[in-house]
Regions:
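Short, flexible loop segments at the rims of nucleotide/cofactor-binding pockets, characterized by
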Residues: 18, 67-74, 91
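Soluble or luminal CAZymes and related metallo-dependent hydrolases
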Residues: 24, 70-84
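Short N-terminal targeting/anchoring amphipathic segment
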Residues: 82-93
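N-terminal strand-loop element at the rim of the active site
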Residues: 9-12, 29-72
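Nucleotide-activated donor-dependent transferases that construct or modify glycoconjugates
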Residues: 1-18
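Short amphipathic alpha-helix
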Residues: 19-32
């Protein structure tokens, strides 16, 4: 199956600091890749994965050297990237 994994942008996948959701996204993504699914991860560029990575922002928002006052623009970009490629996937998760 072609699966899109859509991660929060606050932490990298897997997280360098606290990030329960991002850790679960990482576990699930790596297991799906191990089961020979074609997995694409939409996440921050500092994420590490065996899946295809579509970087949404340069670094996880919480780790950015420039304070992120409003994360809405980053999430709009995430949704834009997913929407443009949605037809390529069997599952969006």
């Amino acid at each position: 199956m072609k699966i899109a994994q859509i991660a929060p942008l606050a932490e990298s996948v897997p997280p360098k600091l606290y990030g329960g959701t991002e850790r679960i996204v990482s576990f699930l993504t790596e297991e799906l890749v191990g089961m020979n699914h074609d997995v694409t991860l939409f996440a921050s560029a500092d994420s590490r994965t065996n899946a295809r990575l579509v970087p949404v922002c340069e670094v996880a928002l919480r780790l950015s050297s420039r304070p992120v006052v409003d994360s809405v623009a980053h999430y709009v970009r995430l949704l834009e990237l997913v929407f443009k490629q949605a037809h390529e996937f069997d599952i969006l998760h």
